[in-house]
Amino acid sequence: MNFELTKEQQMVREMVKDFAKKEIAPHAEHVDQTGEFPMQTFKKMGELGLMGIPFPEEYGGSGGDTISYALAVEEVGKACGSTGLSYAAAVSLGASPLYYFGTEEQKQTHLTPLASGTALGSFGLTEPNAGSDAGGTQTKAISNGDEYVINGEKCWITNASYARTVIVTAVTGKNKDGKNIISALIVPTDTPGLTITSPYDKMGVRGSNTAEILLEDVRVPAANLLGDPTKGFKQFLYTLDGGRISIAALAVGIAQAALDASLAYAKERKQFGQPISSFQAIQFKLADMAMEIDLARQMVLKAAWLKDHNRPFTKEAAYAKLFASEMATRACNQAIQIHGGSGYMKEYGVERMLRDAKLMEIGEGTSEIQRLVIARQLLK
């Protein structure tokens, strides 16, 4: 058993840490207050190779592994939760399905721009009546000769307003048991009949684009069908498993930022003639935060390691996502408490971290769904 990162993984972490400190963190407050999507930041991230860390160089990627990618997500998330969420979604949801399930032509055409950072991708799964019940998808794709005609609605889709392509899940038929067959299709965002709006006013991660997608007689070539048409449900479950690793890493990053801010404040703030860091009540909070953050980080790294070694990782990804997300909310809440009245003020940033962290318990599978996933893995 080896707990040391490789030299390559350490280099990635240090590179992203330096970039995030200089290029992302200074804009975090502005991004949150205005809700502006940090497009220029993503262009720089693309130039640096961050958008393609876990993909082979032949598709425009950096040839890294899942661990390196998780470390990168943590560092970006530590600097800005909004940017971290859009980064995680672009890679894990927008690009990864193309790599794992796409044909060679689909990879060259659609994955390469995403992995090289010249475009963003998105993943359209959630619907108004299909949230946790993802199998309840109502969007339909009807085969019509050499194309599919798609009709339906998607909601709460990350990055869609700025994406070049959206991978859309849709019902394409029924199996012999009468159950819906859910498939995935690659839909360029400039396709006629596709309307993308962003009507949401969110509590947190406000600079991460969240969109609604309306599909009205959207026609795409049959060649845009992604993977096995009868296994679309399993494909997006695998996609979500990978995405949960990145959300867990993002939660760790946000929590680490809250701890860093709390340590600095506790050393500086004086009450009763001494720094509040000298009081046991504050020390216990800091100790609990640090312990839980490190535990969550190890969970993330283990799940990523399993994925890199082609071993089952569904349960471990759910472990990491569940614990890290709930931990981040606790850590950020404690950070506000340590800051006292100042923590309730926007200028200190920790209240933003709490608002950002809360989404980690909801997006890409709620805490309740994670517990179901874990229980089913234990009982099967």
Swiss-Prot record:
FAD binds at residues 123-132, 156-158, 269, 337-341, 366-368. Gene3D superfamilies: Acyl-CoA dehydrogenase/oxidase, N-terminal domain, Butyryl-CoA Dehydrogenase, subunit A, domain 2, Butyryl-CoA Dehydrogenase, subunit A, domain 3. InterPro entries: Acyl-CoA_DH_CS, Acyl-CoA_Oxase/DH_mid-dom, Acyl-CoA_Oxase/DH_mid-dom_sf, AcylCo_DH-like_C, AcylCo_DH/oxidase_C, AcylCoA_DH/ox_N, AcylCoA_DH/ox_N_sf, AcylCoA_DH/oxidase_NM_dom_sf. The keyword Oxidoreductase applies. The active site is at E364 (proton acceptor). Keywords: FAD, Flavoprotein, Oxidoreductase. Pfam families: Acyl-CoA_dh_1, Acyl-CoA_dh_M, Acyl-CoA_dh_N. GO terms for molecular function: acyl-CoA dehydrogenase activity; flavin adenine dinucleotide binding. One of its GO terms (biological process) is fatty acid beta-oxidation using acyl-CoA dehydrogenase. It catalyses: a 2,3-saturated acyl-CoA + A = a 2,3-dehydroacyl-CoA + AH2. Its cofactor is FAD. The keyword Flavoprotein applies. It is an enzyme of class 1 (oxidoreductase). GO terms for cellular component: cytoplasm. It comes from the Bacteria. Its EC number is 1.3.99.-. SUPFAM superfamilies: Acyl-CoA dehydrogenase C-terminal domain-like (SSF47203), Acyl-CoA dehydrogenase NM domain-like (SSF56645). Belongs to the acyl-CoA dehydrogenase family. This is Probable acyl-CoA dehydrogenase YngJ. The gene is yngJ.
